Amino acid sequence: MSFDKKLLEIVACPVCKGKLDYDKAKQQLICKLDRLAYPINDGIPVLLENKAESWEEA
């Protein structure tokens, strides 16, 4: 199952409530403000702070 990009209109970072960006290659949602990456498992975003990984822009 793939991630539905329409979800980006309604989901937000659980930490700062900011906008999330989709990283298709890594299957993650990125919060650039908090520098966190949230995994997407089987097309479902896991928006739990304890599941987020540190993110750095390439």
From Swiss-Prot:
InterPro entries in the record: Trm112-like
Similarity-based family: Belongs to the UPF0434 family.
Species of the source: Shewanella woodyi (strain ATCC 51908 / MS32)
Record lineage: Bacteria, Pseudomonadati, Pseudomonadota, Gammaproteobacteria, Alteromonadales
Disulfide links within the chain: none
GO CC term (a single one): cytosol
UniProt cross-references to Gene3D superfamilies, sorted A to Z: 2.20.25.10
Protein known as: UPF0434 protein Swoo_1821
